């Protein structure tokens, strides 16, 4: 069954609502330039209230390694998502399983995938202005081609109206959504989250 991650969680209300809808993982953005930014202490307070068996993911962009590892410990992160230009060596020093994000413009964007020995590869649309959460899509054929390298988490422009099509086309390990289920940056829409999870899992 396709896993679902709801990213950009900033409130306990949204976290519990996403879990109730059937989300497998929640993402917390520790990148201060993001409109979905949350501080480690605030995230930790939310995470402590979550039910068991929900995966907790922390998103970082070219952060100091010590900050990543300290935040992972403070929050009890299950997985670290690296969304910048982090090297394979850097990934190897993170004290959690790593999901490395690649911002896809074309096949050349994925040339470095084999260099990264990580738990999963997140494929997102390229934007010169933002590291994720843009609502932009990329050609899913690139995701299909990348599946031979390992687990693929599909992101970029997904929403309740197209996620079933994406799952049918790519058959990814998981799908990741942020802006596609929002009322405003950092606040989720209950009905969109419910529909997204249901649509993502209906073909499984």
Curated annotation (Swiss-Prot):
| UniProt EC number | 5.3.1.24
Q: What CDD domains does UniProt report for this protein, alphabetically?
A: PRAI
* Example GO biological process: L-tryptophan biosynthetic process
TM ranges:
none
Q: Which reaction does it catalyse?
A: N-(5-phospho-beta-D-ribosyl)anthranilate = 1-(2-carboxyphenylamino)-1-deoxy-D-ribulose 5-phosphate
Q: What pathway does the UniProt record associate with this protein?
A: Amino-acid biosynthesis; L-tryptophan biosynthesis; L-tryptophan from chorismate: step 3/5
Give one GO molecular function term: phosphoribosylanthranilate isomerase activity
Sorted UniProt keywords: Amino-acid biosynthesis, Aromatic amino acid biosynthesis, Isomerase, Tryptophan biosynthesis
List the Pfam families hit by this protein, alphabetically: PRAI
Question: In the UniProt record, does the keyword Amino-acid biosynthesis occur?
Answer: yes
Q: Top-level EC class, please?
A: isomerase
Q: What PANTHER family does the database record attribute to this sequence?
A: N-(5'-PHOSPHORIBOSYL)ANTHRANILATE ISOMERASE
Q: Of which family is this protein a member?
A: Belongs to the TrpF family.
Q: Which NCBIfam families match?
A: PRK01222.1-4 (NF002298)
Q: What's the protein here called? A: N-(5'-phosphoribosyl)anthranilate isomerase
Q: Which organism is it from?
A: Geobacter sp. (strain M21)
Originating gene: trpF
């Amino acid at each position: 069954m396709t896993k679902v991650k709801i990213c950009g969680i900033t409130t306990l209300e949204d976290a519990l609502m996403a879990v109730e809808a059937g989300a497998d993982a929640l993402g917390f953005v520790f990148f201060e330039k993001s409109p979905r930014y949350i501080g480690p202490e605030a995230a930790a307070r939310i995470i402590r209230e979550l039910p068991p068996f929900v995966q907790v993911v922390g998103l970082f962009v070219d952060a100091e390694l010590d900050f990543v590892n300290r935040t992972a410990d403070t929050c009890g992160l299950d997985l670290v998502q690296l969304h910048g230009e982090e090297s394979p060596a850097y990934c190897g020093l993170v004290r959690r399983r790593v999901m490395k994000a690649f911002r896809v413009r074309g096949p050349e964007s994925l040339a470095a995938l084999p260099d990264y020995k990580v738990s999963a590869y997140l494929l997102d649309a390229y934007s010169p202005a933002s590291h994720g959460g843009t609502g932009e899509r990329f050609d899913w054929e690139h995701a299909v081609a990348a599946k031979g390298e390992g687990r693929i988490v599909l992101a970029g422009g997904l929403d309740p109206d197209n996620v079933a099509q994406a799952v049918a086309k790519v058959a990814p390990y998981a799908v990741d959504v942020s802006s596609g289920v929002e009322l405003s940056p950092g606040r989720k829409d209950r009905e969109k989250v419910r529909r997204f999870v249901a649509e993502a899992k209906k073909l499984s």
